[in-house]
């Protein structure tokens, strides 16, 4: 399905990502963890082709994504949608119009200029908002929503592209614990119900363990861990974060206090929806 083959990104003398290799042979939810500057965001931006790799290849269904240009590159970016920490919404525009922006890559310039959308796209946008629990806010300006609601609007916009892969770059870093939980549950359900691959950069170990099928650890641009959530021990975490024996997971905790925190959310996301 998706293969990242020795992907490297250099900025001058600095190597941001160093020969990263990943194989994703079926839809799953992957969490990428590591310290700030480990190369997590750069890796996602290269996969989406927002940034070009210096070396290496990205293969999707045996097609070399790194060679795509023009319309083919834009089509890939729709197939591999990206969600950002800062939401990237148009604040003074209503929620449903922000969601409809997910269709811009397949609309004419004239239709874009005059905000002309097919009725079926409008209905689909509202259905997606309803699925994410925010259809009641469709007519509101995006700036009137909470951070968690805005991030769900960003997820809805990504879903309008009908992507095979969703890349989420620190999707909960700016959210309070309760909204962070809501957003992660939404991403988990999208994977489980739609069969989409979700790859999320995460800043907390407990979030990666709770919601992901697979965890990738990056340190200094290299992938130093790739395994199951239960294999992410404190010792492994120390290696990923470059910490000594005093390392405490509490420093990376989202502090979401739930009764079933000990259970992987990949087993219970549906029950908490």
Swiss-Prot record:
Cellular localisation: Cell inner membrane
Membrane topology term: Peripheral membrane protein
Keywords in alphabetical order: ATP-binding, Cell inner membrane, Cell membrane, Membrane, Nucleotide-binding, Phosphonate transport, Translocase, Transport
PANTHER family linked to this entry: AMINO ACID IMPORT ATP-BINDING PROTEIN, PHOSPHONATES IMPORT ATP-BINDING PROTEIN PHNC
Protein name, UniProt field: Phosphonates import ATP-binding protein PhnC
EC class: translocase
SMART domains per the UniProt record, alphabetical: AAA
GO terms assigned for molecular function: ABC-type phosphonate transporter activity; ATP binding; ATP hydrolysis activity
Species assigned in the record: Ruegeria pomeroyi (strain ATCC 700808 / DSM 15171 / DSS-3) (Silicibacter pomeroyi)
Gene that encodes the chain: phnC
EC number: 7.3.2.2
Domain ABC transporter per the UniProt entry, residue ranges: 2-245
Summary of the function given for this chain in its UniProt record: Part of the ABC transporter complex PhnCDE involved in phosphonates import. Responsible for energy coupling to the transport system.
NCBIfam families: ABC_phnC (TIGR02315)
Binding site for ATP: 34-41
Disulfide bond sites: none
InterPro entries listed in its UniProt record: AAA+_ATPase (IPR003593), ABC_transporter-like_ATP-bd (IPR003439), ABC_transporter-like_CS (IPR017871), ABC_transpr_PhnC (IPR012693), MetN_ABC_transporter-like (IPR050086), P-loop_NTPase (IPR027417)
